[in-house]
Amino acid sequence: MTRGLYIESYGCQMNVYDALMMEDLLRPVGYAAVSRPEDADIILINTCHIREKASEKLYSTLGRMRVIKKEECILIVAGCVAQAEGEAVFERAPYVNVVVGPQGLHTLPELIMKVKRDKKQINIEFPVVSKFDAISIDRKANGGVSAYVSIQEGCDKFCTFCVVPYTRGPEYSRDVEAILEEVKQLTDRGTKEIVLIGQNVNAYHGTYKGNEWDLGKLIQKVSLIDGVERIRYTTSHPRDMHPSLYEAHRDEKKLAPFVHLPVQSGSDAILRKMNRKHTAEEYLRVVEQLKDSNKNMALSSDFIVGFPGETEKDFEETMKLVESVGFALSYSFKYSPRPGTPGAEYSNQVPEEEKSARLAALQGLLTKQQLQFNKSMEGRVMDVLVGDPSSMRSDRIFGKSEYTQSIHISAPSGSEDCFNRMVRVEILHGRQNSLEGTVLSNAN
């Protein structure tokens, strides 16, 4: 008899991928996804520790699930908060049955079997054998017209504001053949866009027949798989932009001319305190090389304002860098200390009102740049990836550009031919957060 599995997942692209992996892992032992926690025999909360108050969000969610779950339902906490909190989850929420960190997800079937005998199970180890090596991916969970494929996990950079090295562990690159097999499984099910993901994705150094491959070479190989029409990758670190990656952007037409390249600050003094391992000038050189590799290149980034010790001069240098690059879109946040990170122990914490004022100024500039970029799309013809019929509203369908912009497309008669494929679209209007266009023809 099939039992119900309800997964509630927060956070980054890797968590989306991990949730699909867990669904695939539990299917062979008799669990299938359900849409309501009330109907589940397992409720799994897949957590993220990047943003502020992540733990409070978890315990609030657990309290809600405790009230509505079935009496015999197994309650599981997975992900980065599980890794960081460990046994403390059981102390604050004794009704939780399983705590499992990101590197122990492949042990879920075993933990669930054990919990029926021993009530509580925990696995927050960083194993010698990676979860990528411990399981064989079988992508039964539908990835859709666009799907994530994890190629790298963990981080060795140890930025002083970041919990990732402590919750995801050291950098590990997945075997090339396993990646290619997963991409083939996805394209066989109709996926058109492959998004290669990792905490530090351009640090990828997998192996293929005894030889080491970097991300640029992997992209070239993925592009040869039948059915792949667009390739993206995220998230990148400025220190790991290798020559082969610039070459891939120059030569590989299926690779989107868009890179998410976090910089965090434009001040060298703050970049040193953050342990970012690059200067503002080095970041700008990477940007220049990317733009030289493809005339259509655009970038997005992440920024933290109010890092300990940030002066008004430091912040002005960040604004100067933003003006110099001209980002297509970006994400900006006020610094908030993460327990266990060096930054949490720094003196010279910036007052909240100063953080708020700087964030407003930075977001104002980034918003202006985003609108300018979207307006620059007017009159262009581009290939747009359109999802399934659920993306249709009245006389419009919705798609994603090669720059990840949402596009509202006037739907012609016979628009059912547009779904789950690449469509040729003329952009008529650029708005703040989206584009508007009209279908010309299918791209393929």
Curated annotation (Swiss-Prot):
Domain TRAM residues, every copy: 375-441
Binding-site positions, [4Fe-4S] cluster 1: C12, C48, C80
Gene it is expressed from: miaB
Gene Ontology CC: one annotated term: cytosol
Similarity comment: family membership: Belongs to the methylthiotransferase family. MiaB subfamily.
Domain of life, per lineage: Bacteria
UniProt keyword terms in alphabetical order: 4Fe-4S, Cytoplasm, Iron, Iron-sulfur, Metal-binding, S-adenosyl-L-methionine, Transferase, tRNA processing
Enzyme class: transferase
Binding site for [4Fe-4S] cluster 2: C155, C159, C162
Role: Catalyzes the methylthiolation of N6-(dimethylallyl)adenosine (i(6)A), leading to the formation of 2-methylthio-N6-(dimethylallyl)adenosine (ms(2)i(6)A) at position 37 in tRNAs that read codons beginning with uridine.
Positions of the Radical SAM core domain: 141-374
UniProt protein name: tRNA-2-methylthio-N(6)-dimethylallyladenosine synthase
Subunit text: Monomer.
Compartment(s): Cytoplasm
EC number: 2.8.4.3
Catalytic activity of the protein: N(6)-dimethylallyladenosine(37) in tRNA + (sulfur carrier)-SH + AH2 + 2 S-adenosyl-L-methionine = 2-methylsulfanyl-N(6)-dimethylallyladenosine(37) in tRNA + (sulfur carrier)-H + 5'-deoxyadenosine + L-methionine + A + S-adenosyl-L-homocysteine + 2 H(+)
GO MF annotation list: 4 iron, 4 sulfur cluster binding; metal ion binding; N6-isopentenyladenosine methylthiotransferase activity
Details of cofactor binding: Binds 2 [4Fe-4S] clusters. One cluster is coordinated with 3 cysteines and an exchangeable S-adenosyl-L-methionine.
Span of domain MTTase N-terminal: 3-117
Any Pfam family matching the protein: Radical_SAM
